[in-house]
Each structure stands twice: as C-alpha cells, then as structure tokens.
C-alpha cells in the first residue's frame, strides 16, 4: 500500500533497518547501531517474509533494508511489513477478505515464533 492512484503492483515485502551513518538517532542513541539488534531484525524480517509467502502464496517482493525512522528509532528488533497494495484493484479484493486477514495473522505469528526459536537457539 505504498502508491497512489491505480497500479499493478502486488505482493508482500518486509523492511528492516541496517545502520547508515547518514541517519543519526534522534531518540535511540544507545541501541541505534547495536549489532545484535540489527542482526535480529534481519532474521525477523526473513522469518516473517518466508512465513507470509508460504501461507498466502502472494508475490514475494523480498526483504529490503531501509532507513525508515520507525525501524531506526527502536531499542528492540523491528520490521515493517507491507501486506499488499490497495491501489491494485485485484489485490484490494483479496486484502478485504476476512479469511485472508486470518491467514496473514497466522503467518505473522508463525514468523515471529520462528524468529524467536532462531535467536534463542544461538
């Protein structure tokens, strides 16, 4: 749901923050460039993306690094998931279905559980 107007973009994508010295922290000085937090965010992004694609069959738009403040200014592992494109009429019809919401919720929970198992198993 990142565009305006009508598009044919579709699928699911997940973002995590990788340190960029161009973006200095405004809130999160202590954990801004914490290697463990950043590594766990990358693992979380991959686990959630894998689970979402497996559960929904949506187009895999991948896992990407970004410098969004919502990711940068956290003290814990963080991701941003784009679950679809509301400006694509056919995708919007899928996004509006209650059954699809249930599958998304299940996949998000499963991805978080898989992430937890991966980071706790270190």
List the model feature ranges, each with a label.
Residues 1-122:
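Active-site-proximal helix/loop segments of hydrolytic enzymes
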């Amino acid at each position: 749901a990142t565009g305006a107007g009508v598009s044919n973009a579709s699928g699911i994508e997940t973002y995590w923050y990788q340190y960029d010295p161009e973006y200095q922290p405004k809130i999160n000085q202590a954990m801004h460039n914490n290697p463990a937090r950043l590594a766990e965010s990358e693992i979380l992004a991959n686990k959630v993306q894998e689970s979402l694609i497996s559960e929904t069959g949506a187009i895999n738009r991948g896992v990407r690094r970004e410098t969004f403040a919502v990711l940068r200014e956290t003290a814990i592992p963080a991701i941003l998931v784009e679950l679809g494109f509301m400006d694509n009429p056919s995708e919007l019809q899928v996004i509006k279905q209650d059954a699809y919401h249930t599958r998304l919720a299940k996949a998000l929970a499963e991805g978080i559980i898989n992430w937890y198992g991966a980071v706790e198993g270190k």
